[in-house]
Amino acid sequence: MVGASTLAHDVRLQALRLYLVTDQFCAGGRTLADVVAAAVQGGVTCVQLREKQLNTRDFLAQALALKDLLAPHGIPLVINDRIDVALACGAQGVHLGQSDMPVTQARRLLPPEVFIGWSVETLEDVARSAELPVDYLGVSPIFATPTKTDTLPPWGLEGLRQVRRATTVPLVAIGGIHVGNAREVLLAGADGLAVVSALCAAQDPCVAALRLRQLIDAV
């Protein structure tokens, strides 16, 4: 079994429980700030800014705005991929995919208190994580999802159970998760749920987050 990273203690599991990943295209004309603010009121515990279509200047501006929004609530901001933006805005975390900067290089660049998440798409990735300074693993995708199509076939619940048996590192499940399947994903071994369209596309992100948070807290 892969053991937890020496840095894993820096990530409180509670902060990973309901993890919003932004997607402006799902927001239905609303600003990201409006969606995030509503979701925070509903109980989101972590927010990842993932807007790959933005140029560096706009991405940084969005990151700074979200950090200001989240700070009074003590909710960590995670930056997807962009180490430079994470450093510039003082983000609390960074999430890296398989094609992003290698984790070991990112760790050298980031302050020790900044936590790192890493997406895993195969059991080989999970095994490799034992040698990496990662604080949580993003298991992606659990179910098929239209918000991210450049991935391998979905893990499914049994795949998630296999990952849980293979590692003690905290697991955040993402991909096609909603109120109808959230409980079974948690019971399969996820420590937290990352959601995109379930909140960003919701008519009322506050109510949607509240429903998810109630399910999570009941498990």
Curated annotation (Swiss-Prot):
Mg(2+) binds at D81, D100. 2-[(2R,5Z)-2-carboxy-4-methylthiazol-5(2H)-ylidene]ethyl phosphate binds at T145, P146, T147, G176, V196, S197. GO terms for biological process: thiamine biosynthetic process; thiamine diphosphate biosynthetic process. InterPro entries: Aldolase_TIM, ThiamineP_synth_sf, ThiamineP_synth_TenI, TMP_synthase. Its EC number is 2.5.1.3. One of its GO terms (cellular component) is cytoplasm. It comes from the Bacteria. Pathway: Cofactor biosynthesis; thiamine diphosphate biosynthesis; thiamine phosphate from 4-amino-2-methyl-5-diphosphomethylpyrimidine and 4-methyl-5-(2-phosphoethyl)-thiazole: step 1/1. Condenses 4-methyl-5-(beta-hydroxyethyl)thiazole monophosphate (THZ-P) and 2-methyl-4-amino-5-hydroxymethyl pyrimidine pyrophosphate (HMP-PP) to form thiamine monophosphate (TMP). Belongs to the thiamine-phosphate synthase family. HAMAP family: TMP_synthase. This is Thiamine-phosphate synthase. It comes from Albidiferax ferrireducens (strain ATCC BAA-621 / DSM 15236 / T118) (Rhodoferax ferrireducens).
